[in-house]
């Protein structure tokens, strides 16, 4: 995640550029939200009033060296999918502020869904995963989302403690390295910018394995309504760090490493500049049954080096035998990659047209030890399609008037089988790409989003999906059909 200060700095640089009427309206609108307000010696406490930026706030407290902003949140959506319909309602609260070099933020939203088709709506879908509360029924369920962080910043960096998502890389409908489709998790994070052309990031996160540790069960009492055993889950963690280089204007090159490990925390993975892969090999005595699940990833992005054009590529390497990359009989190319590009102001001002291709080979994200899969609460932290798939996409973005975003996408997806642990670690040659083909999917998606006032959105989308299954019983809940979403939302999305 990027900070509000970074957003403000980027917006203020645009004030030095000659903008047309539409661009100036949008700039002024976003400055209402992100422009810093200088405090005074006397505290100003206001409720349901506009602040100095003319931004309506639920409550704000501004004074020298401290400010606090509080806003309610809520949404109402009607979702119709494959002949079923349900209503989603939410309410919550967010606040954020700063005290000199310390900053903080909090986000809480409680959701209730009533109707039919809620389960099928999220299967094989880029919708965010949820952790259901209480006892869901066929026609009703409740879940919540909470995020928050406290950070300390200095001129060239910051350190944070929080609960949030991580995003890394580019992708129109999924990111192969880290995506925000999973439920949020606790983390500590270090961001350091020693020079203008280099950036370093480190994170250690506490994940949810969703696997009960049977050895840790013990009696908690007799007669409790939920049973007498104390249940504990296998501890699961992730450490990741990356370097971003900016050798010239518009060109960013990034390289990083991550490791998912389990059972107990390890101080070696708290060292931001450690080489996780080598360290893990040493601590496990090169015993695969004692080791962790390590990954490498790289990315390159070229923006506006060719006028109005963005080109990008990412690669996620789970396992690879460098000496036999091109030897089909012995290779273990368990990796994924994304290649994409877009052109803006093509045919019409503010029209962006783009294309993207993603391929993730078999067995990427999985591990010999189930608690070390590249997942958070059973959902892949990378691309939502998992592994053994490819996706070809065409997309368009258009902003005909200020604050209105239109989006259209066509994608074609092929999905192979999951395979077995024995096939992953023992088969030679490895099963081919798209082995045990499960399904082919083609879909059209269109969406509009209009931000009427700051953080108040009018939303709508239409999606038409056509599935072809090798075996019609593979996913009986997922069939061809249409999905329509309409609603309103207030607050950070």
Question: What residue spans do the PLM features occupy?
Answer:
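Exposed, low-structure sequence patches enriched in small/polar residues
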Residues: 143, 246-493
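Outer-membrane beta-barrel channel domains
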Residues: 3-5, 10-252, 257-259, 263, ...
